[in-house]
Amino acid sequence: VYVLNSSIFNMYGGEISGNRADAGGGVYVTRGGGFNLSGGQIKENEASSGDGGGVLIDNGVFYMTGGSIDNNDAESGNGGGIALRYAYFAAISGGGITYNSANGVGGGICVSGGSQLTISGGVSIESNKAFLKEDQDERPSGQGGGIYVGDGGKVTMTHGRIWSNFAKSSGGGVLMAG
């Protein structure tokens, strides 16, 4: 699903699965678009060379109040489940982000480019993995199994659970890199 130019995608149920793209394997939001996830599944999608195996928000807005983002992969990028780059605003207040992986940073969620993420409610960020890239270029990798925050990103968490995540390098649960 590609959302741009102030369009809004509301997902109340159903499934987005088995898709592959360079970036934003399941959902890619850019240029002021928005995505509201309140039910359904985003699962088993892949970003083959960029960020956001399940969801990529690049200059857009994201709200998650329910549903799940599971078993997605950023094969050569960041944010296996969700990648937030220059997101205007993002809030997660329900649902689960589980069993995602990235061969970069942020197995579950990557927050970068000054993006702001608020986590509240009964959110579960569980069993996500950040692996080391094989090519080992200058960018960090293997950090922030559950959540990676870098490049001016900000996360505020008032409730939720981050558990049983893995990072090959550092920050199994969360890595805050500035």
What is the role of each PLM region?
Residues 1-2, 20-30, 46-57, 73-86, ...:
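Extracellular beta-strand/beta-solenoid scaffold signature
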Residues 6-7, 14, 25, 33, ...:
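The right-handed parallel beta-helix/beta-solenoid scaffold, focusing on the short coil/turn
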Residues 124:
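Conserved acid/base catalytic micro-environments in cytosolic active-site loops
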